[in-house]
Amino acid sequence: MEINVAKRTGFCSGVQKTYNEVKNSLVDKNKIYIYGELVHNRKVIEELNSAGAITITGMDDIPDDSIDETLIIRAHGISKAEKDLLKKRFSKVIDMTCPIVTNLVKYVEKKQKDGFFVVVYGKPDHPEILGLKGNVDESKLLITLSPVTIPQKKVLIVSQTTMGEEEYKNFITSILTINSFTEVLIRDTICSETILREKETLELSQKSTLMLVLGGKNSSNTQKLYRISKKYCKRTYHIESGEELKEITISPQDKIGIVTGSSTPTSELNKVLEYLSQEKEDFS
């Protein structure tokens, strides 16, 4: 059995910083609030909850005694209106919005002021997109996953930072084909970490007989890695933890490739490697 692990695994830098901030804050406090699910990973959420982190998903979840408490804004970011309200309800608000997301918001804002209508390739209900909508002029904004005809002629095209590079390129080609823009700007706003993980997944899946994509089942970037891998390696499995390996048939001849989503902790990867090492030993 051969085991190959992608070079880029574990949390991305934005998630890691937010996770560290939560853990450090809990050293001095017995509880801390997080606005929105920190990461799309059940194991991480359970770990933080047991340590004293409390997730709130909206203003209705804020307790009456919150004025003495600290709240952390996750890496996806939120709307300006939400942030202003939270600052009135909590004594301390720590904004951990990923810099890449912040840069996208600022760029869209600037270009709208320059007269551009903005088309965003992304999921309308994704937390990052909801935050973007709440910080820019929605009347000059379209969020879509499908190429559509647009009456505006001066257009900026950008992407949600966690979308697939190849899918974004296909979207651009299609939307340019069905529209006649007089002025169009195209900006690559996909996170470089996302692109590098995609490339590693592509390479590993082409030389593996079995691929393990480790990450939350509701994680957008993990689902994307799974789709890429499945194209080239039919025996691709999307798993959340090492416990699921018991359901997968592994042979001594397998060449196993392992990749992780950006919201997957290294601890979960280590459990998977531990299980596979034991399997390898049992085969020999």
Curated annotation (Swiss-Prot):
Q: Which cofactor does it need?
A: [4Fe-4S] cluster
Could you say which residues bind dimethylallyl diphosphate here? H40, H76, H126, S219, S220, N221, S263
Q: Does the keyword tRNA processing apply?
A: no
PANTHER family assigned: 4-HYDROXY-3-METHYLBUT-2-ENYL DIPHOSPHATE REDUCTASE
The free-text function statement in the UniProt record for this protein reads:
Catalyzes the conversion of 1-hydroxy-2-methyl-2-(E)-butenyl 4-diphosphate (HMBPP) into a mixture of isopentenyl diphosphate (IPP) and dimethylallyl diphosphate (DMAPP). Acts in the terminal step of the DOXP/MEP pathway for isoprenoid precursor biosynthesis.
Q: Give the UniProt family note.
A: Belongs to the IspH family.
List the protein's name: 4-hydroxy-3-methylbut-2-enyl diphosphate reductase
What is the taxonomic lineage of the source species? Bacteria, Thermotogati, Thermotogota, Thermotogae, Petrotogales
**Which gene produces this protein?**
ispH
